[in-house]
UniProtKB/Swiss-Prot annotation:
Gene3D superfamilies the record matches: Ribonuclease E inhibitor RraA/RraA-like (3.50.30.40)
The organism's taxonomic lineage, starting at the top: Bacteria, Pseudomonadati, Pseudomonadota, Gammaproteobacteria, Pseudomonadales
Protein origin, superkingdom: Bacteria
Family of this protein: Belongs to the class II aldolase/RraA-like family.
InterPro entries found in the cross-reference section: RraA, RraA/RraA-like, RraA/RraA-like_sf
Comment on bound cofactor: Divalent metal cation.
Reaction catalysis annotation: 4-hydroxy-4-methyl-2-oxoglutarate = 2 pyruvate; oxaloacetate + H(+) = pyruvate + CO2
The enzyme's E.C. designation: 4.1.3.17, 4.1.1.112
NCBIfam families per record: NOT-MenG, PRK09372.1, PRK12487.1
UniProt source species: Pseudomonas entomophila (strain L48)
Pfam families listed in its UniProt record: RraA-like
Name of this chain's protein: Putative 4-hydroxy-4-methyl-2-oxoglutarate aldolase
Subunit structure of this chain's protein: Homotrimer.
Keywords: Lyase, Metal-binding
Length: 163
């Protein structure tokens, strides 16, 4: 597992990276994570999140535009454990998570706005692999995202940690 330090990446690639507005907190078992972006756009319905974490996620980060909802949790312990089992590097969720005491022990990165105990509906509503914009940045499928306790950054191409 690669360790990322976003301040070092920002120093090394200042003209390449975009930095998200500082509104995310780390809820996962990994202090840092990064990888190729897979996007989901959904609102209080995590059907597509459930589908994607069942797939091979090696080298990938699931970026979920949940509309910033603070009323439902788009990720909980069961889906986080599936994501870890299937090799996902992490998830960046513009929305809430739950089961935070379990998430912090799960080997997957999770950045989200807050915790909320209520689960979502599963109506099969949402879009996969579309450009999504939140926190002042547009995420495009196939680009790259890196996260740690300092923040979250996006790059059009993969970044290497400076030596």
């Amino acid at each position: 597992m690669q360790h990322y330090v976003t301040p070092d990446l920002c120093d090394a690639y200042p003209d390449l990276v975009q930095v998200l507005e500082p509104m995310f907190s780390n809820f996962g078992g990994r202090d840092s994570f990064g990888g190729q972006i897979v996007t989901i756009k959904c609102f209080e319905d995590n059907s597509l999140v459930k589908e994607q974490v069942d797939l091979d996620g090696k080298g990938k980060v699931l970026v979920v535009d949940g509309g910033g909802s603070l009323r439902r949790a788009l990720l909980g312990d069961m889906l986080a454990e599936k994501a870890a089992k299937n090799g996902w590097e992490g998830l960046v969720i513009y929305g809430c998570v739950r089961d935070v005491d379990v998430l912090v022990q799960t080997d997957v990165g999770v950045q989200a706005l807050a915790s909320h105990p209520m689960k979502t509906d599963k109506r099969g509503i949402g879009d996969l692999n579309v450009a999504v914009t939140f926190a002042g940045v547009t995420f495009r499928p196939g680009e790259y995202v890196y996260a740690d306790n300092n923040g979250v950054i996006v790059s059009p191409s993969p970044l290497k940690m400076p030596e």
